[in-house]
Amino acid sequence: MEVNILGVIATALFIIIPTSFLLILYVKTASQEQEQ
């Protein structure tokens, strides 16, 4: 089975970008709660 490099990269970005975005939002809200 031949692996499509562009397909793998697109899938990785499709998973990593939303996940990192949610992590950043979570860290921001968590740090704000600790400050209060």
From Swiss-Prot:
Protein origin, superkingdom: Eukaryota
Name recorded for this polypeptide: Photosystem II reaction center protein M
Family matches, as NCBIfam families: PS_II_psbM
Protein family: Belongs to the PsbM family.
Subunit composition and interactions: PSII is composed of 1 copy each of membrane proteins PsbA, PsbB, PsbC, PsbD, PsbE, PsbF, PsbH, PsbI, PsbJ, PsbK, PsbL, PsbM, PsbT, PsbX, PsbY, PsbZ, Psb30/Ycf12, at least 3 peripheral proteins of the oxygen-evolving complex and a large number of cofactors. It forms dimeric complexes.
Primary subcellular site in the record, as a coarse category: plastid
Entry annotated with the keyword Glycoprotein: no
GO cellular component terms attached to this protein's record: chloroplast thylakoid membrane; photosystem II
Pfam families, sorted: PsbM
Localisation: Plastid, Chloroplast thylakoid membrane
Membrane-crossing residue ranges in chain numbering: 5-25
Keywords: Chloroplast, Membrane, Photosynthesis, Photosystem II, Plastid, Reaction center, Thylakoid, Transmembrane, Transmembrane helix
Membrane topology recorded in Swiss-Prot or TrEMBL: Single-pass membrane protein
Originating gene: psbM
Functional summary from the UniProt entry: One of the components of the core complex of photosystem II (PSII). PSII is a light-driven water:plastoquinone oxidoreductase that uses light energy to abstract electrons from H(2)O, generating O(2) and a proton gradient subsequently used for ATP formation. It consists of a core antenna complex that captures photons, and an electron transfer chain that converts photonic excitation into a charge separation. This subunit is found at the monomer-monomer interface.
GO BP terms in the entry: photosynthesis, light reaction
